């Protein structure tokens, strides 16, 4: 696996499962009115760059101010992988990473807010014991006090290699 790049070892490749897990996102209920927006679309002839007659379709989008809870975990990242992941999270905070479909049409813009980070060094017998005995939950002391400083430190490690 030494031939794989850090991005492949972090997010996965055809021969190796990734270390990052992002489960389905849950809607923050008070931000969603319960209705999807329906938008019109037309089929485009890619060779001519023109609309194709009779190829109209509708698609649904989530209203723009809808918020989602997101969770991300990384299993055993090395310092470079952690730095790459931190750089990606920082770009999400800045709103530079569109998500979902039709991003070239202006959909999918998002900003990550309210970041919290838990950092468990499970190579430490004491932290591993706390985690395995059920103390590795909210309020367990594994939450990083300053998530932005943690991201900065991880990103700086990319350039210290």
Language model regions located:
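Small/polar/charged residue-enriched interaction surfaces, especially the RNA/DNA-contacting tracks
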Residues: 1-161
